[in-house]
Amino acid sequence: MGKIIGIDLGTTNSCVAVMEGGKPRVIENAEGARTTPSVIAYQEDGEILVGAPAKRQAVTNPKNTLFAVKRLIGRRFDEKEVQKDIGLMPYTITKADNGDAWVEVRGQKLAPPQISAEVLRKMKKTAEDYLGEEVTEAVITVPAYFNDSQRQATKDAGRIAGLEVKRIINEPTAAALAFGLDKQEGDRKIAVYDLGGGTFDISIIEISEIDGEHQFEVLSTNGDTFLGGEDFDNRLIDFLADEFKKENGIDLRNDLLAKQRLKEAAEKAKIELSSSTQTEVNLPYITADASGPKHLVVKITRAKFESLVEDLIERSIKPCEVALKDAGVKVSDIQDVILVGGQTRMPKVQEKVKEFFGKEPRKDVNPDEAVAVGAAIQGGVLQGDVKDVLLLDVTPLSLGIETLGGVMTKLIQKNTTIPTKASQVFSTAEDNQSAVTIHVLQGEREMASGNKSLGQFNLTDIPPAPRGMPQIEVTFDIDANGILHVSAKDKATGKENKITIKANSGLSDEEIKRMEEEAAKYADEDKKLRELVDARNSADSAIHSVKKSLAEHGDKLDAAEKGAIEKAVQELEDVIKGDDKAAIESKTNALIEASQKLGEKVYAAGETESSAAEPGEPQEKTVDAEVVDAEFEEVKDDKK
């Protein structure tokens, strides 16, 4: 049985970890980094870049470089948060046929789960390269405050990437696992403050020792799925653009290339201001007008940056108050405060958290890696490798159905431990009503219209009866992933209808299957492209070696032999420009064969000459190197 890997699919960066010898280990990617930018670029030739290579070319390809796609996952196009992002993102956010927010790249409409799947595939490959075996199962984390549609969409992304998602777990819970696994300090209540690239979560978690078992029980969770480091970056971008406009009368936000350079600079400046009190943003040739090129040079102090984002930091405090109230604990009951997410490195954020909780946050948890580590631990629990750990998570939002008068009747209250099941009996509103529509909602508002609609289905063929007589039992069942299954049953006839909530939008199974096939096709094309590049490298190497040997020892061959080798070189040089791998390999072999005569001649000459002078030895090596070099290249290709 293969390993279950843990993946933190982040808005800005992603991370993968695995349990090894009872300890979680974060895995470095192909670029040698422990985190991978969640950036995907679609090239003109159809190639898809993921991670650092995609981020590097963002300035020159802003419209086709996608970042922060997690902010769109499982969301409707008309939601106000999505509308706000449309104005900020250099890429095109568009409305799908089902009303979801999708992205348009190079004339093709893509669903957010399809784009996120590219990042997951990179994480999968990173783990496979390290483990030396295929990986098919994963635990993927999501913000605790993600609703049902967003969780379902994340699961879909895993499927498209070729992963069976064994469990979806909440990011703060994962961080608590990473923090508390090796702590033998009895019962303690902790607060996990998770401010990432695009989302904010706060969870109050109790870690207890029960019969030698570590129990992690989430008491409450709250958050804001549209608050994160990206918003802090945007404040800096606006500030820089405004300063430049004041001075030069040009708004850089209207120029995609300039805006992308601003984004890069803002991110760097923000990071620098965590360790120094002032930084300078220096962007030469940012734009030009009739008077010539323009340069942007702006000094930013830490105090200035803090004043720009003060309200964003303040926005994170309200959910903390609600979470404490929901958990029924006082600030003084919290023993440890754990910071997760890169944005918590900002001194002002740490200061605000310290001020609210009245204690210094812990510094022994890596904010970038804790979530992936926790996911890997949960993978180990599911696999049976990690014993004595029990995780009790909660559903972040209340769930219910719409009843008479457009009211939301809650069946499951927020912060209920999952998995859980709840039933309630409802009846008809009209005489002789033969069908009822079950409209499933998620949220905290009293009226149905103020909450998120998760979907609806009908229960038909109810026997005619006066209003209020039929007994319709509605059952809500939330699984361990926090995904909802709903059934409605007519108690008189036993007739039942049930659905797993697929958001009234979301991806259908057919769409997911198509995207899986597309992903597999791309993987196949990538493999073919790599094999073609390897074949070209072998051919180049053979041409170089033979030409070198001809220049040094060509006079030992007669004209016909020399002509045959030159012809083989020419033929290989002609096919190397094309895309036919078989032709390149065949002509490479033909060249190696043709040049063997040269090798023999040189070898023979070397044998007859005196060993003192040893002119033959290096010559013999040169030709040998030519033959062996080509063979060596081929062996290396196979490994690839």
From Swiss-Prot:
Keywords from the named record: ATP-binding, Chaperone, Nucleotide-binding, Phosphoprotein, Stress response
**Phosphothreonine, modified sites:** 199
The record's Pfam families line, in alphabetical order, gives: HSP70
What triggers expression? Answer: By stress conditions e.g. heat shock.
Report the domain of life of the source organism: Bacteria
Query: Is the Kinase keyword given for this protein?
Result: no
- PROSITE patterns per the UniProt record, alphabetical: HSP70_1, HSP70_2, HSP70_3
Composition bias of kind Acidic residues appears in 626-640
Residues of the region (Disordered) are 603-640
Recall the GO molecular function terms of this protein's record: ATP binding; ATP-dependent protein folding chaperone; unfolded protein binding
- Family membership: Belongs to the heat shock protein 70 family.
> Which PANTHER family does the record cross-reference, listed alphabetically?
HEAT SHOCK PROTEIN 70KDA
Q: Which NCBIfam families match?
A: PRK00290.1, PRK05183.1, prok_dnaK
**Protein name (Swiss-Prot/TrEMBL):** Chaperone protein DnaK
Origin organism is Methylobacillus flagellatus (strain ATCC 51484 / DSM 6875 / VKM B-1610 / KT)
